[in-house]
Structure formats: C-alpha cells, structure tokens
Amino acid sequence: MLSLRQSIRFFKPATRTLCSSRYLLQQKPVVKTAQNLAEVNGPETLIGPGAKEGTVPTDLDQETGLARLELLGKLEGIDVFDTKPLDSSRKGTMKDPIIIESYDDYRYVGCTGSPAGSHTIMWLKPTVNEVARCWECGSVYKLNPVGVPNDDHHH
C-alpha cells in the first residue's frame, strides 16, 4: 500500500503551457478613466489615473468611485446627487402631490412642513407604487421614476 501512495503523490496532471484560452483569461481589459460625465460607463471608469511620477496628485488624479462621479459633475456644473431642497411653498395633497424624482424605485424625503421649518423633520419613503404622507402636516409626496427601467435580467 505504501508504494501506491507514493505513486499517487508523484502523479501530476498534464498542463498545457501554451494555451490561447489561458492567455485570454489572464489579459486584463483596457478601461479608459472617465474625464467627464459623458465618459462614465460603469464603476471601472470611475478610478482616477493617479499622479505622474514626481508630481503632487490633484483631486481629479486620485478620486475614485462616487467621489469622482460627484467631482466630474461639479466640474460640469451638475449636481449628480440632486441635493437641492424640496418645494415647501405649498402642501402636497392627494390630488396634487409634490413630485419627487428618483433613479431608484424609492427615495427618502425629509418633510419640514409648509412653510419650511414648521415642524421637525419627518422622514418619509415614497415608492413607485405608493405616495408618502407626512404624519405631522399631511403633505403628500409622489415619486416620479426617471431612471432606466429594470429588465429583471439576472446573470
């Protein structure tokens, strides 16, 4: 039995040293770093190129991810996270709600009443299917989806 163990231990499966599929799998795809919002095409394009040797990096050189997306937007004068305050000049009603735009199927909204600051912030969550009504002042918020429709395609 000892000789059988030793022969199994020395058995090595044959490997192909030159294989085109192995070469293709080891190749890294070339990804261009986005220099403006129009060039953003997924998270891999939101990685900064880094500073050239011997120079001090700028924010544009080293920002990555959402911080880079926000910086590219600010350079073009676009608020990518839509942080402007909601319309508080009126109360939303069921017939005429305050419209909230969102790229997702829900959004968190902080209601402070009408006029603004009438009550403490009440956090609401309007969805695509339901409006949200403030418990304090009764103002109604409705979601307007502006994003790409979900095709429910799973990999």
From Swiss-Prot:
One of its GO terms (cellular component) is mitochondrion. GO terms for molecular function: oxidoreductase activity; zinc ion binding. Residues 1-25 form a transit peptide. One of its GO terms (biological process) is mitochondrial electron transport, cytochrome c to oxygen. It is found in: Mitochondrion inner membrane. Pfam families: COX5B (PF01215). Component of the cytochrome c oxidase (complex IV, CIV), a multisubunit enzyme composed of 12 subunits. The complex is composed of a catalytic core of 3 subunits COX1, COX2 and COX3, encoded in the mitochondrial DNA, and 9 supernumerary subunits COX4, COX5A (or COX5B), COX6, COX7, COX8, COX9, COX12, COX13 and COX26, which are encoded in the nuclear genome. Belongs to the cytochrome c oxidase subunit 5B family. This is Cytochrome c oxidase subunit 4, mitochondrial.
